């Protein structure tokens, strides 16, 4: 490769510049820009403008003018240019969209192309980039200028190409067919892949495990030789112009599809179909090695069944990723165009492929079986796609493709002499290796029967790398993966480890069973479902079937019988039912082609391989070891159709009667189940109804009790209020009673006091009978006299005869009796005085002398008003009767019959204040004047009981009380007295 910055190394200044031509920087495509940047060890990522700017800077650093530098570009054939121009737009677009093809470009050898594909494989499958140096340990082939010279001299004619290939450098021819170096490289690549596989993420581990299984078993297989058949020749003629670099690109695509089968199978199929259409126009002859023409033939044949199966899988829901597919298809077309342009790399490019190649002497393989397998798989492809475990069909197809890739077939008879010689050698070698291959397959199948280990009880955080590192302590680990139950993710984790030998597997069980990993106790045991054993039996059946079509093979009957036995064993494993219409369809499909055994092989191996899908096998009651390679939607869509394919495989077991009987039993069980379910539902509804009724009754009873409780509470409150009211009334009554008793007691005390005062008063009156002087000025203070009193005429009382017999019979001994009689009489007449004065006392205490107690005789104040003028003015009672009243006592008893009822009203003066003042004035008048002889001399007054009225004049006339207005005292000789027709106005009572 040219050194950057050197003029001699630059293609623009090399010796072939004139032949190849140059282009300016602005005319370069993205891939050319990246090639120039790669030469200078610069970054090749980014779009076209970024790449162009980066290259300009590189030219400026080299001291060149970017716009004036002419960049050489290899002269490819017209047809190749036509094809590249046809896809140039898609190439540039893919280059801008995806930076993964940064190492692939024109003008470089096949090693770089292989590195590009290997890098893409590394990125797609999750293998670390550190693998690249180990995997690509094949020496670099040739210099860039040598390759450019060969490309410049390339011509359309096969002879010219053969002549040019004869002139290849020794370095290219040295590595073209180096058997030992290639085998060592292949072993190193396989071991590196195995070691690095455990570091992948969990979703990528199943696919990589497939790759390891394929590499570990296929690369060591020795495929038998197969003579070129009539079916091979047309394909070989149509594709003989394809170089080995095209094969490298296709093998690279196959390697990618192994890494991501669910995403890239469809795009690979479409790419191969497009390539087959375009290969008719590509007449590039490359016959450096015998593998080149037959490789294209084999791929043309092998892609057809892949196309059918992958299209079926891609049509399933969830098999999308169309944008990614388109980008990868663009990238693949570009690499294939580069491989065609660099076809002179020949065997060198083939040797640079680390995997998928076999010993050159043994590379005449089974291309003749491929057309037959194609026809069989075209018929069987829908069944394979709809099998109960659809991912296994893809796995088997990938194995088939790898077999076809590794076992490079012999060229057609039109090839050169060297090709014919190689064909003969491979034929002889193949015949010698038939029996060793069969024995090797059987030995490997028996050897691998016990090397699969099932690890249970793993922690959810356990990864495949942990299992790989743990089990590698006790032997060589072929593959390790962690599987889970897809129907309940995260529930439990299991591990599936494949050891290199069964002895190592047994050793791992003895050392690792019931040990701790990540805090969980793990159990290691032999896998019950042996996918590797079934795969080996499938592969053995495949190899034996490939021997059948040769006309000189003595084994077809034996192999077919063996395959029939395998088929029946697989059918017996299925427990599902199959309808009669499925059987008819299968019979029709079986009649379409005589090679039904071949396509049934694909289907059965596919259905077996799907045991590695992450599911739980309900019929077996254990986890089924599987690989989750597609989305769940695709799994569901495939599982929804698996009963058809399973039914087709059981056409030799169940008859119509058995099917009907089985379906009838199933329907009967279904009916019984429905009846039981209905009965249970009815009982449940009845219980629920009863519970609802009970709840309703309970609620109603509770409401009734609540209402009654409220009523009782209201009654209790009402009774409490009534009780409180009664208590209040009782307390009020008792209070009134206490007050009444107190009042009665007070009244009794007052009566006693009054009686005592009366007794004291009588005793005092008896003790002293004082004559009080006439107080003239006291009359002025009387407020009851509104005007001055007129002087009475002296002849006022002249006409009143004065009875002389009133005091004749007075007896002093009756004075006490007279006093008591006067008091009783005054008490009896008090009611009339009160009625006359307008004073009404409803209480009975005022009707029996109580007026006297309150007014006249209260507290002894009634009779001491005479003592002074002040007391007279205050009006605190009547003055006591004069001592002369004793003289009236005896005479009063004689006058009692002669008194009229008006006397009491006229004389009763103990309640009004002006009455006793008048009587007092009368006393003064009576006492002051000279009275007649019958009045006691010196006593000066009248009786306190008011027997005589006040005269009102100073002459001292004694006016008898009977002559007063309003009634008075009538004498015993009434008829002899004449009343005064003109009474004195002072004696007229004013009420």
Swiss-Prot record:
SUPFAM superfamilies: RNA-binding domain, RBD, SAP domain. Pfam families: RRM_1, SAP. Residues 323-336 have a biased composition (Basic residues). Residues 362-377 have a biased composition (Polar residues). There is a cross-link at residue 60 (Glycyl lysine isopeptide (Lys-Gly) (interchain with G-Cter in SUMO1)). Residues 25-59 form the SAP domain. It is found in: Cytoplasm; Nucleus. Binds to scaffold/matrix attachment region (S/MAR) DNA. Can function as an estrogen receptor corepressor and can also inhibit cell proliferation. Interacts with SAFB/SAFB1 and SCAM1. Interacts with SRPK1 and inhibits its activity. This is Scaffold attachment factor B2. The lineage of its organism: Eukaryota, Metazoa, Chordata, Craniata, Vertebrata.
């Amino acid at each position: 490769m040219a050194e950057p910055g050197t003029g001699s190394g630059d293609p623009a200044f090399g010796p072939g510049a004139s032949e190849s031509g140059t282009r300016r920087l602005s005319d370069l495509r993205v891939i050319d820009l990246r090639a120039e940047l790669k030469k200078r060890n610069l970054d090749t990522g980014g779009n076209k403008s970024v790449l162009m700017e980066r290259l300009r800077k590189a030219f400026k650093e080299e001291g060149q003018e970017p716009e004036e530098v002419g960049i050489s570009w290899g002269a490819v054939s017209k047809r190749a240019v036509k094809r590249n121009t046809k896809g140039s737009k898609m190439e540039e677009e893919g280059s801008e969209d995806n930076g993964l093809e940064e190492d692939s470009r024109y003008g470089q050898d096949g090693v770089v192309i292989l590195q590009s594909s290997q890098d893409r494989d590394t990125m797609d499958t999750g293998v670390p980039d550190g693998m690249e140096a180990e995997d690509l340990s094949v020496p670099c082939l040739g210099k860039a200028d040598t390759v450019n010279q060969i490309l410049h001299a390339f011509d359309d004619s096969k002879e010219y190409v053969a002549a040019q290939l004869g002139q290849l450098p020794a370095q290219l021819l040295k590595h073209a067919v180096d058997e030992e170096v290639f085998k060592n490289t292949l072993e190193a690549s396989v071991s590196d892949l195995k070691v690095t596989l455990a570091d992948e993420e969990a979703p990528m581990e199943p696919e990589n495990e497939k790759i390891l299984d394929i590499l570990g078993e296929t690369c060591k297989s020795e495929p038998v030789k197969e003579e070129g058949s009539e079916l091979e020749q047309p394909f070989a003629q149509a594709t003989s112009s394809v170089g080995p670099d095209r094969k490298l690109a296709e093998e690279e695509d196959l390697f990618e599809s192994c890494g991501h089968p669910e995403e890239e199978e469809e795009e690979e199929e479409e790419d191969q179909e497009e390539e087959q259409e375009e290969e008719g126009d590509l007449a590039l002859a490359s016959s450096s090695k015998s593998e080149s023409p037959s490789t294209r033939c084999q791929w043309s044949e092998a892609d057809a069944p892949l196309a059918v199966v992958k299209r079926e899988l891609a049509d399933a829901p969830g098999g999308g990723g169309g944008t990614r597919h388109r980008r990868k298809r663009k990238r693949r077309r570009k690499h294939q165009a580069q491989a065609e342009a660099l076809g002179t790399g020949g065997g060198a490019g083939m040797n640079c492929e680390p995997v998928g190649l076999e010993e050159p002497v043994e590379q005449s393989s089974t291309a003749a079986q491929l057309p037959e397998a194609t026809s069989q798989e075209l018929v069987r492809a829908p069944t394979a796609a709809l099998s109960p475990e659809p991912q296994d069909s893809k796995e088997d197809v990938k194995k088939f493709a790898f077999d076809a890739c590794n076992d490079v077939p012999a060229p057609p008879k039109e090839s050169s002499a060297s090709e014919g010689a190689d064909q003969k050698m491979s034929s002889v070698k193949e015949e010698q290796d038939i029996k060793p291959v069969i024995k090797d397959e059987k030995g490997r199948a028996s050897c691998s029967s016990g090397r699969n280990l099932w690890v249970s009880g793993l922690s959810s955080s356990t990864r495949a790398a942990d299992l790989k590192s743990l089990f590698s302590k006790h032997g060589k680990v072929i593959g390790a993966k962690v599987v889970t139950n897809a129907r309940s993710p995260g529930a439990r984790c299991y591990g599936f480890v494949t050891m290199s030998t069964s002895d190592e597997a047994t050793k791992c069980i003895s050392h690792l069973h019931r040990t701790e990993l990540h805090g969980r106790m793990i159990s290691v045991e032999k896998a019950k479902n042996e996918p590797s054993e079934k795969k080996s039996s499938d592969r053995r059946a495949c190899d034996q079937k490939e021997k059948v079509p040769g006309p000189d093979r003595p084994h077809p009957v034996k192999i077919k019988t063996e395959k029939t036995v395998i088929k029946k064993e697989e059918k017996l494993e299925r427990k599902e039912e199959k309808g009669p219409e499925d059987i008819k369809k299968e019979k029709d499909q079986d009649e379409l082609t005589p090679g039904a055994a071949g396509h049934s092989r694909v289907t059965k191996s596919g259905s077996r391989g799907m045991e590695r899908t992450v599911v739980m096998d309900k019929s077996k009651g254990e986890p089924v070891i599987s690989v989750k390679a597609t989305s769940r939607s695709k799994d569901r869509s495939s599982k929804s159709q698996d009963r058809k394919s399973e039914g087709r495989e059981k056409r030799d077991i169940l008859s119509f009667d058995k099917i009907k009987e089985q379906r009838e039993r199933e329907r009967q069980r279904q009916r019984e189940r429905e009846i039981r379910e209905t009965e249970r539902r009815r009982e449940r509804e009845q219980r629920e109804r009863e519970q609802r009724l009970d709840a309703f009754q309970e609620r109603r009873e509770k409401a009734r009790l609540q209402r009654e409780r409220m009523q009782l509470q209201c009654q209790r409150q009402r009774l409490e209020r009534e009780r409180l009211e009664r208590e209040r009334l009782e307390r009020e009554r008792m209070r009134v009673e206490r007050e009444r008793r107190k009042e009665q007691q007070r009244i009794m005390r007052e009566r006693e006091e009054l009686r005592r005062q009366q007794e004291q008063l009588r005793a005092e009156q008896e003790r002293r009978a004082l004559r009080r002087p006439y107080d003239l000025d006291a009359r002025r203070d009387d407020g009851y006299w509104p005007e001055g009193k007129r002087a009475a005429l002296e002849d006022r009382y002249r006409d009143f005869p004065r009875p002389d017999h009133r005091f004749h019979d007075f007896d002093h001994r009756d004075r006490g009796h007279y006093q008591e009689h006067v008091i009783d009489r005054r008490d009896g007449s008090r009611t009339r005085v009160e009625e006359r004065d307008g004073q009404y006392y409803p209480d009975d205490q005022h009707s029996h002398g109580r007026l006297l107690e309150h007014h006249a005789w209260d507290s002894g104040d009634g009779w001491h008003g005479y003592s002074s003028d002040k007391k007279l003015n205050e009006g605190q009672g009547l003055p006591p009767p004069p001592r002369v009243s004793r003289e009236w006592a005896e005479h009063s008893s004689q006058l009692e019959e002669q008194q009229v009822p008006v006397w009491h009203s006229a004389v009763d003066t103990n309640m009004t204040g002006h009455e006793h003042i008048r009587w007092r004035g009368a006393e003064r008048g009576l006492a002051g004047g000279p009275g007649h002889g019958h009045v006691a001399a010196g006593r000066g007054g009248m009786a306190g009981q008011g027997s005589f009225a006040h005269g009102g004049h100073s002459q001292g006339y004694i006016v008898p009380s009977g002559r007063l207005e309003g009634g008075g005292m009538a004498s015993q000789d009434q008829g002899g007295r004449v009343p005064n027709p003109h009474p004195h106005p002072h004696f007229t009572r004013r009420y």
